[in-house]
């Protein structure tokens, strides 16, 4: 059934208006589909919400599943493996004058020196003993310090690794003041750079490995810059932030007053919340039209998406607006609802969930307006909304928001590699709370105790009639 016929005239007119069409980007970006596990139970709130044993179970549109957003999370700790050879070599065999003790092949790492002239590199036996192989993995083949792993083909410490890398990258040339046979050990490795570098080569460090590493890093950085730039051009976070700022009431219009104490407002906090929601539904349409590419969708699809996500979109807004409020929420009308008022009105449980699962988490991570706008855009572009003419197009727009948000987090908060995932983890709570709020609203509508204005009533009634 065509859901737009259930919208009031104002709603359809606002959605159809072209005066506020958002600027659009061009081109598209394919977001890699990675699927790191975020632990059991994380994805379930965003999957199928299940059957609600309440009157709200008949509301199909607002409670469609969002689909898991985690498929695009690139875990910073993805699977890596390191191949460790079972027969490492020191680079000098038993024929070396430095390893000629019959009692102990390596009596002291300080005795290891490069051979005179360094014209040839002698090899250790092809199959050293197990103890010897284990030992060489834990010491630096150049200076005898603790090895941090295999670098450029040789087990070495961070100091010798860095020295060799700098020498190769800067193409440095050294000279020896003695006879080119200086002792290179942990204490004296910095005394002669020439002999240290020659020993790196003698032990098997490869210059080409440094150059390949540098090229790989350069290619990776160029790809990241290109990817970030492409994502932001397609779904610019600046436009999403502009949409948030355009519809958010100015701070000075807020009135710091409890619901029950404000003589100009009803004593019932539920009534005030419903009235505030009704007013915000008008601005919600204006906000959506400012989100890039939303106005390019078919009009029917725009209506479907707004109907499916209006409750979560409004909850996200007033939750973020309430970050500075203690034990309460701040409505767009400027009214402050304290948790005591909510408990006295019988909605304390859901109110406490808003405070602990949304407001508190947003406050702790200091979620900014751009991040809030991106999360709301993710909610808006819900490809699982019933009745969409082209769900794939909506899903592509959602993935563009994911990409832009991830790029924004990496750029703005480089010291917080897990911030993008932490933001997405607020969506399950938002979905669950949104469903519970719909149950409450539908119950209030049925019993008729709470005045529900026309726009909000239309949102509640239309999906019910369409099912």
UniProtKB/Swiss-Prot annotation:
Glycyl lysine isopeptide (Lys-Gly) (interchain with G-Cter in SUMO2) crosslink, residue number(s): 4
Covalent cross-link (Glycyl lysine isopeptide (Lys-Gly) (interchain with G-Cter in SUMO)), residues: 113
Annotated family: Belongs to the nuclear hormone receptor family. NR2 subfamily.
Record-level GO cellular component terms: mitochondrion; nucleoplasm; nucleus; RNA polymerase II transcription regulator complex; transcription regulator complex
UniProt protein name: Retinoic acid receptor RXR-alpha
Gene from which the chain derives: Rxra
Entry comment on modification after translation: Acetylated by EP300; acetylation enhances DNA binding and transcriptional activity.
MF (Gene Ontology): chromatin DNA binding; DNA binding; DNA-binding transcription factor activity; identical protein binding; nuclear receptor activity; nuclear steroid receptor activity; RNA polymerase II cis-regulatory region sequence-specific DNA binding; RNA polymerase II intronic transcription regulatory region sequence-specific DNA binding
